[in-house]
């Protein structure tokens, strides 16, 4: 007689593929681990961060290609460090832009703002840099692109569009991120300026999005930008 014992409950020590592939250490150690060509999987909800450098073309013109390129590469290193510190993963760079993913929205917000402050307050003799950033949270699809795991879907597309609403030094976040309890608590404690924004985004013309702009304390003192209009379109 044979008796079969089966346990269907998740182990407390188990992690999903979505969680593992969203960690920087996994991408560093297993960079070539990917899905079969043509295969895609839903990985649940992730927080997607897109960043871009403000006026990078002007920087190349003013200080020369070699020095500007060095600053861009250093800026990638800074972002990667803060992203990893918050248990996120840098997925790819596109020109001067970065795509990263996190399991928790508050981790994305903290990583961005820590990096933003480091860029705004460089060492003596350094050149300040300003980021534009969009953060969104929602379901994503994982695929293999250029032999690496990448993410696609509306959540990613919206995060990329939010960058276009930025002015520099700020971040625009979706309502899904804004309403997250951990994000609300963090922003309340950090005392950054929060501006409500309502916008239509390219490719989503039938819908207006309720968004929020985060203007960090260190950016407020330096900014001469006009106040945010109630409705914007990008």
What are these regions (language model features)?
Residues 6-13, 97, 144-148:
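Short hinge/gating elements
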Residues 1-13, 198-204, 208-210, 215, ...:
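PAS-family sensory/regulatory modules and their coupling/dimerization elements
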